[in-house]
Structures are given as structure tokens and as C-alpha cells.
Amino acid sequence: MQFFLIFFDIAVKRAIFVVMEEDLKTAVEVMRKGGVILYPTDTIWGIGCDATNAEAVDKVYKIKKRASNKAMLVLVGKMEDVENYVETVPEMAYQLNELSEKPITIIYDNALNLAQELLGDNSSVGIRVSREVFTQRLCRMLRKPIVSTSANIAGEPSPAFFDEISDEIKSAVDYIVKYRQDDKTPHAPSSVVMLSADNTIKILRP
């Protein structure tokens, strides 16, 4: 009986892995073609695309009906990736990312190699190193940062779970990730800090 349960558990995990791999491949393929996806992150479900593709980013703004002067954050798979998209990564950023007990979004000045629409004042950009395995792999397979913005029309409540996302949003994206659609685990929003090149920190959200 115990052997059967172990075998069954392995089979289930393998099935989940296969489904996840197909999900990842499809999502990456869609983004490489300039498409927009709906996907789970380490906080809430988000709308995403290749953050270096200006046309794809523009699609996200249109789907959300979001003002073009409002910046959006991006996700990367590991801290070292930040160096490709920011002129100077302050030493403090590595410490904050390592020591923070919850997901942390760091706003840096002088962004590089990203769609201009994503940037705020001083060419600033919010970047978070994802702590969620699916999103980490998504970033690594795409080899680009991914836009992450809540899956709602601007001004409406941000959905905490997949089944709270409106049909309007679901029908507007090019691909909906299957992974974690039934997950009801609550996820806290990320901390948000602004970090200057001289390591000065301003906490925007604890």
C-alpha cells in the first residue's frame, strides 16, 4: 500500500511538471511574438509581456485602460539580471533582496534596455526578483524581464485570485497560464522601496 502511494505521488508530480513545462513553453512563445499573457506571480495574478518590446507594452496599457504616464514594474528571474536594465545597481539592492522576508520591488533610477512607456521620473523603473518558481522560469526561458501589472481595468479592484479576474481582461490577452488557476493561497503585496545610486532608501510600502 505504501509503495502504491509513493508511486501515485510521483506520477501526480510528474503530470504537474509536464503540464507546467507546456504552459511555460507556450507563454514564452507568445511573448516572443509580442503577445500578452495572464499569469500568476509571487503576489497576485498579473498581465505581462516582454518588457523590452514597446508594442507589447502598449497593448498592456490598452488592455488595462491605464494612463500612459503611469509606470509599470517588471519581474526578473534573478538579482544578476537587474544589472542589464539599470545603469547602476546600488550595493544595498543585493542586501535588500536577500534579507527581505516578503517579495520586494525596488525602484531604480536610470533604467536601460526597457520599453520607455514603463519608466517613471528620472527614467526610473520598479524591478522585482520573483520568488515564485513558475515566474522565475518564465523570465529565464524568455531571457527578458516581464511586465507585471495587476489583472484589472485601471481604477477597479485588483483580483486576488484567478476566478476574480474579469472576462474583459481574460478575453483581451493572448494566452492565459493554466498553472495555479485553482490556487486560493493568499499572497501579500510586495514591499516597495526607492533606492538611489548612493544607497539612500525611501520606503514607499513596508
Where are these regions (language model features)?
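Intrinsic disorder/low-complexity segments
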Residues: 5-6
